[in-house]
Design a protein with these regions (language model features):
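Bacterial N-terminal signal peptides that target proteins for export
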Residues: 1-11
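Amphipathic, positively biased hydrophobic alpha-helical segments used for protein targeting
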Residues: 11-13, 121, 238, 364
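Short, linear, compositionally biased motifs with a strong N-terminal bias
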Residues: 13-16, 196
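N-terminal signal peptide c-region/cleavage motif recognized by signal peptidases
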Residues: 18-20
Length: 421
């Protein structure tokens, strides 16, 4: 047997050994690195998580809860079905099966601390960690604060702020985010460009509970022209106490003078204004369709529903009537409006005439833990107590020549990888 094959078999055998059969799993040596890589960006003081997980003393009281959350894949929040469609994404925080097994073994062993000398150096959090997209080049905030009164009804409105840009710039990433306290009362915030009092510049980004940012593939972006203003379309809801918010939008720019080859389009799938979710129904389906008139590359996808949202799948119906499942969010959680940005080497390449089909399911039964009242019929609407069945899509168009070249390059790469196996 060739030595290379022997080493591969030995490595595979080692990977199949249960964690419990190896040396005792400890916090300092085994669990802390997992928490640093996947959890501490939120689980630290003065952030959105309810507890810190920076130290053993922080984590130990929560050991059983940590085990439960990671085994159920509720934490870290990442709800894409990992057995359907495309499985490679940018900034995927989810744990591997081995990491879940490590955390589980640690808790089952009594959550031992381990040697202090095994503890990795503390993760350093800089300003870049405050934004999913990294350190921004520009941050624009609402011109004034808005305070939500304790018992007020839902409020919708617009705020417009100057960008301060004196020259045209292309952006490679954008993120909209409320203030830390505002996260509790902002149902959604949609930012868009305004030129000469006309919102002709297009949508920038959408924030909803738990939403991260949009990071565009290299060579693609959006243009912000000099003198542009930013519209903040806000939806606030009360939580029983006064909360003040001043939402901001952050940008990462390409270098001055750089013009990306492709301009990103951000669209919301068509409305299902006739959404009809009977009281107590646990699996109500709705569908939406959008046809691509030109070849395109789909770079990101984000489902959007409210409390009764259950699942959503995205598929491509090709001109030859074959169908490809692209992505499914099979455990939708209204508390985490996550944008799933495809890794560059797997972004869907869609020919002209492709129909993008979204299928959405709602659960209005008492089995849904997020359902405020299963006795009520629910229809389409902007209020939190209403619901939606929509999806945000980021894509850019390709010429016929670019599309053909991209498909050929991907096929060649797949042939190369196959020959190496």
């Amino acid at each position: 047997m060739p030595m290379s094959r022997l080493f591969k078999l030995l490595a595979l055998a080692a990977a199949m050994i249960p964690v419990s059969a190896l040396a005792e799993v400890t916090f300092t040596r085994d669990v802390a690195p997992i928490l640093q890589a996947h959890c501490q960006v939120c689980h630290r003081p003065d952030n959105i998580a309810p507890m810190s997980l920076l130290t053993y003393q922080d984590a130990r009281p929560w050991a059983r809860s940590i085990k439960q959350q990671v085994m159920q894949r509720n934490m870290p929040p990442w709800f894409i079905d990992q057995h359907v469609g495309i499985r490679k994404f940018k900034d995927d925080p989810s744990l591997s099966e081995q990491e879940i097994a490590t955390v589980t073994a640690w808790v089952d062993a009594g959550a031992p601390q381990g040697k202090p000398s095994d503890m990795p150096p503390p993760r350093q959090f800089e300003d870049a960690d405050k934004w999913h997209i990294g350190k921004p080049d520009l941050i624009v905030s609402m011109p004034v604060e808005y305070t939500v009164k304790p018992a007020s009804s839902d409020w919708w409105g617009n705020f417009i702020a100057d960008s301060g840009l004196t020259e045209d710039r292309y952006i490679k990433a954008v993120e909209t985010k409320p203030t830390p306290g505002g996260i509790r009362v902002v149902h959604h915030a949609v930012t868009s460009l305004v030129y000469n009092d006309r919102p002709e510049g297009g949508t920038l980004n959408e924030y909803a509970v738990g939403k991260n940012g949009d990071i565009y593939p290299e060579g693609s972006g959006k243009l912000i022209k000099a003198g542009a203003r930013i519209r903040f379309n806000m939806h606030y809801h009360a939580i029983g106490q006064p909360i003040t918010d001043r939402t901001s939008v952050a940008f990462v720019f390409y270098p001055k003078g750089y013009q990306p080859q492709h301009v990103i389009n951000t669209m919301l799938s068509p409305n299902n204004d006739d959404l009809d979710i009977p009281a107590g129904a646990d699996n109500v389906r709705s569908d939406a369709y959008f046809k691509l008139e030109k070849p395109a590359r789909l770079t990101g996808y984000q489902p959007h529903m409210h409390n009764r949202g259950k699942a959503q799948c995205l598929e491509a119906i090709y001109p030859n009537m074959t169908v490809e499942q692209l992505s499914c969010v099979n455990r939708y959680n209204f508390g985490w409006q996550i944008a799933y940005n495809y890794a560059d080497d797997v972004t869907p390449l869609l020919p002209a005439g492709t129909i993008i089909h979204t299928t959405t399911w709602h659960d209005n039964s008492s089995k849904n833990p997020f359902n405020p009242d299963s006795r009520n019929w629910v229809g389409f609407g902007n209020r939190t107590t209403d619901d939606m069945s929509r999806a945000w899509l980021n894509f850019y168009y390709l010429s016929d020549e670019e599309f053909k070249a991209a498909v050929e390059a991907r096929n060649a790469k797949q042939r190369e990888l196959s020959s190496q196996r």
